[in-house]
């Protein structure tokens, strides 16, 4: 059998994304409580994200257009988010409230992300993201963590989380996620 890499590139990227998802899932979490949400996206659903990002650029942030172009050059996206409403219960005050009890009474709102959020849950999100992209680097798959992708996917209802980051994946001759000029 002969297989040209171009014929199985998308399958390879999907396998990498699935392994990345499991690395994010098994990453250490505060008190061992898992509030991480992970969704794999490819094909037509990616185009919906890119279109939503272009729509959001009309609000003034033209870098949504640049990042939408990156989405279109990708073979898949991994959405990784966290629910920040569950506290760890240590009253650390990093959220800006005197106690976890006060935090729980706060109105949770936000146009792009929902907050306030427990700082430990956001740390957990960062660790999960780091674990995922570590795997992509080990596997030779290009990625970049992008919050604009997360916002668009959240607005489209693709993931149930308060804060979401998008991790596009690509296996091209050159990474499409660097040397990107800001849009004007």
Swiss-Prot record:
InterPro entries, A to Z: 4Fe-4S_dom, DUF2148, Nitroreductase-like
Binding site for [4Fe-4S] cluster: 92, 95, 100, 118
One MF annotation (Gene Ontology) recorded for this entry: 4 iron, 4 sulfur cluster binding
Reported cofactor(s): [4Fe-4S] cluster
Domain 4Fe-4S: 72-135
Cofactor note: Binds 1 [4Fe-4S] cluster.
Entry keyword Iron-sulfur: yes
Pfam families: DUF2148
The entry's keywords: 4Fe-4S, Iron, Iron-sulfur, Metal-binding
PANTHER family noted in UniProt: 4FE-4S DOMAIN-CONTAINING PROTEIN, CONSERVED PROTEIN
Protein name from the UniProt record: Uncharacterized protein AF_2201
Native species: Archaeoglobus fulgidus (strain ATCC 49558 / DSM 4304 / JCM 9628 / NBRC 100126 / VC-16)
């Amino acid at each position: 059998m002969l297989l040209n890499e171009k014929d199985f590139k998308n399958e390879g990227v999907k396998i990498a994304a699935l392994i990345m998802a499991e690395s994010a899932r098994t990453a250490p979490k505060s008190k061992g409580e898992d509030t991480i949400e992970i969704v794999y996206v490819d094909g037509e659903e990616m185009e919906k994200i890119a279109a939503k990002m272009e729509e959001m650029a009309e609000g003034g942030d033209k870098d949504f257009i640049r990042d939408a172009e990156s989405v279109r050059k990708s073979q898949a996206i991994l959405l990784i988010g966290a629910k920040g409403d569950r506290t760890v219960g240590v009253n650390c005050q990093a959220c800006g409230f005197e106690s976890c009890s006060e935090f729980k009474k706060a109105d949770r709102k936000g146009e792009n992300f929902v907050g306030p959020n427990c700082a430990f849950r956001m740390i957990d999100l960062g660790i999960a993201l780091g674990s995922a992209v570590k795997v992509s680097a080990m596997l030779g798959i290009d990625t970049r963590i992008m919050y604009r992708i997360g916002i668009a996917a959240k607005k489209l209802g693709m993931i149930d989380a308060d804060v979401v980051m998008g991790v596009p994946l690509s296996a091209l001759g050159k990474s499409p996620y660097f040397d990107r000029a800001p849009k004007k």
